[in-house]
Design a protein with these regions (language model features):
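Short, basic, alpha-helical segments at the C-terminal edge of helix-turn-helix-like DNA-binding modules
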Residues: 61-68
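Hydrophobic alpha-helical segments that form the core
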Residues: 103-111, 134, 147-168, 178-187
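Amphipathic C-terminal alpha-helical segment
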Residues: 96, 113-116, 158-176, 188-198
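Helix-turn-helix
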Residues: 9-12, 16, 20-58
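Hydrophobic alpha-helical bundle segments that form small-molecule/ligand-binding pockets
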Residues: 79-80, 116-118, 128-154, 190-201, ...
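Amphipathic alpha-helical segments used for helix-helix packing
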Residues: 85-86, 98-120, 126
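Hydrophobic alpha-helical connector segments
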Residues: 58, 71-104, 153-157
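Solvent-exposed, amphipathic alpha-helical segments
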Residues: 12, 16-23, 70-74, 106, ...
Length: 209
């Protein structure tokens, strides 16, 4: 029972840490103000997570887990959802609340920061990109895209999403970015259709919702 309670407490603290990082970013992370913000002592944070860098790594993993859980629920409800439509839903989810956008921003921030600034190992920073790219790649292969092409297309799609999120953070111009997203996903759909030997779908109007 005590072990279960300890795990629950760790999860509660981790969610609070994620919320704090989502608001304040990864630059100049310090345990003392973070502990104050989440209502625990510095020793309490160290007890559950180890040193600062270990805590940030755990928080980033939690950020990814939250997003994969969202995607997983969509796929359980609709197993036949195409990769392009899954990405459309993901974009809508990102835009649904500032909290969702902040979670996605954390992964991009972690990937972009140098190790000297973040203290994060290179593999952790690379994983912020590689994990999502791999998921997209595997789903494209499942839709019939040849593996080598799926790898390249997944890299392109992940780069597109990263750029769209950065643009959104900087400009807030959702309509323009939605139109750009639809152009990119229409191209992806054409590739999937062509790989299946089907007629390519017509490019949608850029105002598609």
């Amino acid at each position: 029972m005590g072990r279960h309670t300890d795990v629950e407490r760790r999860t509660e603290l981790l969610d609070a840490v994620v919320a704090h990082l989502a608001e304040h970013g990864l630059a100049d992370v310090s345990l003392r103000p973070m502990a104050t913000a989440v209502g625990v002592s510095v020793n309490g944070l160290v007890h559950h997570f180890g040193q600062k860098d270990d805590l940030v790594v755990a928080a980033l993993r939690r950020v990814n887990d939250v997003q994969t859980e969202v995607l997983g629920r969509w796929l359980i409800r609709n197993p036949g959802l195409s990769q392009a439509d899954l990405l459309r839903r993901w974009w809508r989810w990102i835009n649904a609340s500032p909290a969702n956008l902040a979670l996605v921003r954390l992964g991009i921030e972690a990937a972009a920061m140098e190790a000297t600034s973040s203290g994060l190992p290179g593999v952790v920073r690379a994983d912020q990109i590689a994990m999502w790219r791999h998921e997209i790649e595997q789903r494209l292969i499942g839709e019939g895209v040849p593996p080598a092409q799926a790898r390249s297309e997944a890299s392109l799609v992940k780069a597109m999403f990263t750029g769209l999120v950065v643009d959104l953070l900087a400009t807030g111009e959702r309509r323009r970015l939605h139109q750009a997203l639809e152009l990119g996903l229409a191209r992806l759909e054409q590739i999937v259709w062509a790989s299946a030997g089907l007629s390519e779908p017509a490019m949608p109007a850029t105002g598609r919702r």
